[in-house]
Amino acid sequence: MININGEIKVDNAAPFVLFGGINVLESRDLAMRSCEEYVRVTGKLGIPYVFKASFDKANRSSIHSYRGPGLEEGLRIFEDVKKTFGVPLITDVHEPYQAKIAAEVIDVLQLPAFLARQTDLVVALAQTGRVINIKKPQFLSPPQMLNIVEKFREAGNDKLILCDRGTCFGYDNLVVDMLGFGVMKKVTGNLPIIFDVTHALQQRDSLGTASGGRREQVADLARAGMGVGLAGLFLEAHPDPKVAKCDGPSALPLDKLEPFLAQLKQLDDLVKSFAPLDIEA
């Protein structure tokens, strides 16, 4: 079980936590408007909430694609969000020097999937003492996540969350292995597992210089994940996905947030009301 700021409990057996927001900080106004809606909906439904966004999308398909405001301006926007809404924050860090700076504002630091084996970055993140969200690389099997976890533990940080965002299935496609959630729980000693449902809907480079997506299937995939019994959901929404500057094809329309989360809350409550079934291998 992981605590965020002593307030939010992240545990596979506890009510799910929403790590939700926008893909990238397009503007201060978008961050504030989006967070306001997330706070309203999660407050109404009783869902613990952490706001997410990126200050830099350093791994865009094209050099011409929008990356974000950068570290300095991004942290100013994050500070405004935290001051206004009082919610914890999560963002991804791409270079070791950014970790300590981001940790001054950010509550949960994220290790990107494409960088999850970069030892210098792992050590820098671990040394901040912050809670760390480790994205499972699309190219790694669930048992291989233990190697990354052990790097963090050796570097002195066991405040870890694991996040699955799908696995490569041939070229330009991702699938989610629902059995993999349980495998990661088992090999890591039951670390909290969260599910990045919107990135799992990506279709890599299907638009040439940007990733496509299948947002019309987000509810199906999210319900399947919640049925396994997870610590949380990682979600991106946008007021108008068609004009989003990054990953719009995978984003949930923001006006669908309340009915979407209401279904998942009911399902999560039901699944976690069941007595565990211990079935020997």
UniProtKB/Swiss-Prot annotation:
It is found in: Cytoplasm. Pathway: Carbohydrate biosynthesis; 3-deoxy-D-manno-octulosonate biosynthesis; 3-deoxy-D-manno-octulosonate from D-ribulose 5-phosphate: step 2/3; Bacterial outer membrane biogenesis; lipopolysaccharide biosynthesis. GO terms for biological process: keto-3-deoxy-D-manno-octulosonic acid biosynthetic process. The keyword Transferase applies. It catalyses: D-arabinose 5-phosphate + phosphoenolpyruvate + H2O = 3-deoxy-alpha-D-manno-2-octulosonate-8-phosphate + phosphate. Keywords: Cytoplasm, Lipopolysaccharide biosynthesis, Transferase. It holds the Pfam family DAHP_synth_1. InterPro entries: Aldolase_TIM, DAHP1/KDSA, KDO8P_synthase. Its EC number is 2.5.1.55. Its main location: cytoplasm. GO terms for molecular function: 3-deoxy-8-phosphooctulonate synthase activity. GO terms for cellular component: cytoplasm. Belongs to the KdsA family. NCBIfam families: KDO8P_synth, PRK05198.1, PRK12457.1. PANTHER family: PHOSPHO-2-DEHYDRO-3-DEOXYHEPTONATE ALDOLASE (PTHR21057). HAMAP family: KDO8P_synth. This is 2-dehydro-3-deoxyphosphooctonate aldolase. The lineage of its organism: Bacteria, Pseudomonadati, Pseudomonadota, Betaproteobacteria, Burkholderiales.
